[in-house]
């Protein structure tokens, strides 16, 4: 039997490519540490597993593992103190991730927000990140509260728990567009573009918000401007199914053949995702595209490469749209709103 060596286990999974293979290796390390009753290393491994799921997976594993992490770190007051910083960051990741899973009841989401707020205040941190993440949740359920939280986010002091200038400007773009303040949104967006600010998701998300707003307003000139960089930024990215879906919406209106090619190129990402929020937005765009293509008599291919006739495309579009309706009903039931249904 292989001797338990936590440092070697961590070294081994850090050497792997980020994604599913690394996540499997971290789960193996978690099991080994728990079997050895090694609480400090089990806590570290749980942290790494949650981080990997949030930033290189579909966030599904993070939501499963987070309660286990909390139970473990709270067994020992010394461990709880030692891991406070990591725990605060995980709360921040989890309250945002929970927005994307209708399976997490609203009561549980609100409880996590309450716990996160308490920990921030008890340890002298700003509520800026809390307001930002709660505004995201309320953007799908309570627009008035979203607006208030957005204002509080802008007014709260910055501190070390912030996501950095690029991400915070990106949030300003998002929420300013949500409340119809396009001037403020463009001021923030231009800072990102002019200064070439970058994160793993910025400016991809920024272009996505701008494209979505342009399509809602019927401004196809602006939409064409934003879709060009967005297409290359989101293509093949498992995190960006929402943005890919928005590109498909654009292609459904402008270039069906290009849209079919883009859809076929990225549909494997959709099939491999366990994130219902991302799947909803991808499916919404796919259904619009395939419906329009079928109406124009175009054919396509499925994920196996089999050619689909216009009639088969139409049937596939209806199947996808029915899945969208189901997801919309489930999110709206959890959120107690009609946001997702209204987006169909």
Task: Map each language-model feature to its residues.
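Helix-turn-helix repeat elements of alpha-solenoid scaffolds
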Residues: 15-28, 58-74, 101-115, 138-152, ...
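Non-membrane alpha-helical segments in proteins
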Residues: 7-15, 28-31, 40-58, 85-99, ...
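Solenoid-like repeat scaffolds
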Residues: 30-39, 70-79, 116-125, 151-164, ...
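Long, repeat-rich segments with strong aromatic
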Residues: 184, 208-217, 221-225, 233-260, ...
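Residue-level recognition of tetratricopeptide repeat
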Residues: 51, 136, 174, 212, ...
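Alpha-solenoid helical repeat scaffolds
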Residues: 105, 124-128, 132, 142-186, ...
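C-terminal non-catalytic interaction modules
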Residues: 268-344
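Generic helix N-cap/helix-start motif at coil->alpha-helix transitions
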Residues: 1-10, 21-22, 42-44, 87-91, ...
